[in-house]
Amino acid sequence: MNASLLAEISRGGIKNIEVWCAHPHFNYAEQQAIRELASGLEEYGLVLHSLHAPTQRDLAPGRESGFPISISDPERVRRIDAVDEVKRALEVAERIPFRYLIQHIGNNRQAADGRSFDAAFNSLEHLVVFAKNRGVTIAVENTPGEFGCAASLQQFVKETHLKDLRYCFDIGHAHIDTGVAASLELMHERIVTTHLHDNHGEKDEHLLPGEGTIDWDAAMKTLRANPKELPLVLELKEKAAGDPSLDKVCEAFDKLEETAEKAVEGA
């Protein structure tokens, strides 16, 4: 995350951004990196809408590699280490205010068993309070796999009674899971933000909307049926957003907003 990219984003008319907490992308634990981001946001009139909590250590942007960390790791030492890492990300709010921390509850291969469930509860019970004290709401994201799917998240919230926990609805992950409409029905009451990207229903490709098989007309109509006006946050692979002018990203935003407006008018 550098000044030239922030400038390009601003010129494209995008005003609110989500930043991914991966050390090569944004070193959230370093005060100098935080100061530079704060300065860039102010200079280009941008707002930090959300941070995506770290999921791996030493992860290069756009790569699926590195040492994974999980707040639902049944092994106590690793879980506490993961929680501490998330707390470092939340501490960014002491310098740069943001509304939401997007959090994965586990990894894609993790089973929804009792040990993982208890570990996630112990972590989030602490993190929700830590976040709230800094003006941040934790939004758990639906992810591919058994433990992070919409049905599992619904069960988790129902049984843990974590009343301040909210959801980030990831439309691409829902498309891979039981479908957009079915996942949204399970999550709609607690959704506060979104991740929008496309795929072909088989793997997590993070394509631009329209490049996969999601029915965006139906999806936007379903999203806009939510009583809250949910923010539309594009979450793309580096390849998809690789055009330095961000023309394709801005075009995708325009199409989404147009589709959303039509959905509201037709409601």
Each model region followed by its residue ranges:
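N-terminal pre-domain/capping segments
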Residues: 1-88, 94, 250-267
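Histidine-acidic metal/acid-base catalytic patches
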Residues: 2-13, 97, 147-267
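Active-site acidic/histidine proton-transfer and metal-coordination neighborhood
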Residues: 3, 43, 60-166, 226
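Conserved beta-strand positions in the central sheet of alpha/beta enzyme cores
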Residues: 18, 50, 102, 139, ...
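Active-site loop/turn elements of alpha/beta-hydrolase fold enzymes
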Residues: 21-22, 53, 105-106, 143, ...
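Short, small-residue-enriched loops and turns at beta-alpha junctions
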Residues: 25-27, 56-58, 108-111, 142-148, ...
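Flexible, glycine- and charge-enriched loops at secondary-structure boundaries
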Residues: 27-30, 34, 72-79, 110-117, ...
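Catalytic-core regions built around general acid/base machinery
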Residues: 33-44, 123-130, 183, 218-223
